[in-house]
Amino acid sequence: MKYFLMLLGIIPAGTLFSCGAKSNALKTNNMSNDTTINPSAITPDAHTAVATFANGCFWCTEAVFQQIEGVTKVTSGYSGGHVPNPTYEQVCEKNTGHAEALQIVYDPAVISFDELLEVFWKTHDPTTLNRQGNDVGPQYRSVVFYHNNTQKEKAEAYKAELDKSGAWSNPIVTAIEPFKNFYPAEDYHQNYYRLNGKAPYCQYVIRPKLEKFEKVFKDKLKKQ
């Protein structure tokens, strides 16, 4: 149980900052998502697989999964909604159905889907509906978007085990849904922590979370 609480201990650090504030700080007048990401960069090849998770602000979650050995590409974007190629502003209006999500390409010979699930559940609060800390809205909901029956079964089994374990005082509300779509977010959202590490949100929210993550998952980190 302490293993989970160690990571969740960083949540209060974000009380003065919310990822949602970026809608004002980075708002653009462009009403179309003209990201230049090459689709092949987020498409697995014969030696890789893909996982799609939503667990809060993708600025934070991207920085976590980029650290994992065996993860070859992490793309921030939008998934689970009904509006094609949405902009960030549209998603923030809460009527596209999309969640902020990550498309994670990984090498199953190095890191398993089970291990990615472990990181997913232990680096956010899966008991808060449509909310992570100060970030509130359906775009911050907790979801595993499964790509095949094996991923579905593993996610459901892990969720059931967590609920049974009593690791959380409240029920887990993470949804487990079939993958339907993923639209890469605008370029300024990609590699956000790496490119903006000195920004206040990175210093006071993302960095503390990464430090906690690095201590707990030190055996899964990429070699420097």
Each language-model region and where it sits:
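Positively charged n-region of N-terminal signal peptides that target proteins for export
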Residues: 1-4
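Bacterial N-terminal signal peptides
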Residues: 6-15
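Flexible coil/turn and secondary-structure edge motifs
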Residues: 16-224
